[in-house]
């Protein structure tokens, strides 16, 4: 259960939510991605309430989402890399003309991303389910980041991937931030949260117990104390940090 969770993510910012798994992060993202209904409070994107919109409507607002479970929620394993790359944009004019898919454009787009993200595969027609976990994740990240999102939610984006894949994913997230995207990063990886985040909020037992508007001087040991519930900020400290 979430308890009075309130924060804002600005354009050109990576807002990190750190916490041991099972402390409300999944519930929070489920609300933001419309997997759960919002019964109290509100969620706004560029000032517009999205709590009654479908995920399809939200995606039209240049919204990207890298889910925690890439196999169950991020890919269609029996479909090709090319098909997975455009699964969130099949009906757009970029890849569809007169009601027909432009397979040449789709494959060119997939090939560009395969090269940019260094996806190890036999070609764009290979089934995504045949890839390694790290390469599956790069397909998901490429799809969600390649349409210039205004907002990106990245949920445990490098879990279970090798160092090389993690480096590529981190680089892309930071590039999006530098281009003005508002990034919400949810991570249980202390080093990842500290490396990428401009601001960090710590969740424990469904509430924000610490809010760092400046991560300079913050280290893994200190952050870990808040994640374990051993320390917490006062309500006044959180209010001041949020501005």
Which residue ranges define each predicted feature?
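Glycine-rich phosphate-binding loops of nucleotide-dependent enzymes
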Residues: 1-243
């Amino acid at each position: 259960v979430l308890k009075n969770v309130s924060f804002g993510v600005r354009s050109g910012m990576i807002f990190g939510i750190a916490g041991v798994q099972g402390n409300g992060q999944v519930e929070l993202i489920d609300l933001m991605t419309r997997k759960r209904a919002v019964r109290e409070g509100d969620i706004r994107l560029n000032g517009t309430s999205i709590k009654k919109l479908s995920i399809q409507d939200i995606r039209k607002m240049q919204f990207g989402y890298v889910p925690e479970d890439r196999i169950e929620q991020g890919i269609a394993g029996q479909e090709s890399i090319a098909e997975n790359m455009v699964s969130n944009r099949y009906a757009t004019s970029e890849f569809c003309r007169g009601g027909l898919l432009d397979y040449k454009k789709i494959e060119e787009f997939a090939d560009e991303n395969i090269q940019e993200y260094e996806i190890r595969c036999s070609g764009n027609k290979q089934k995504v389910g045949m890839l390694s976990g790290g390469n599956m994740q790069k397909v998901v990240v490429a799809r969600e980041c390649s349409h210039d999102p205004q907002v990106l939610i990245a949920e445990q984006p490098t879990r279970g991937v090798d160092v090389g894949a993690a480096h590529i994913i981190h680089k892309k997230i930071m590039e999006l931030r530098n281009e003005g995207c508002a990034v919400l990063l949810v991570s249980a990886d202390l080093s990842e949260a500290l490396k990428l985040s401009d601001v960090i909020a710590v969740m424990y037992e469904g509430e924000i117990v610490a809010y760092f508007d400046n991560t300079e001087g913050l280290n893994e040991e200190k952050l870990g104390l808040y994640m374990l519930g051993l320390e917490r900020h006062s309500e006044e400290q959180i209010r001041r940090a949020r501005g």
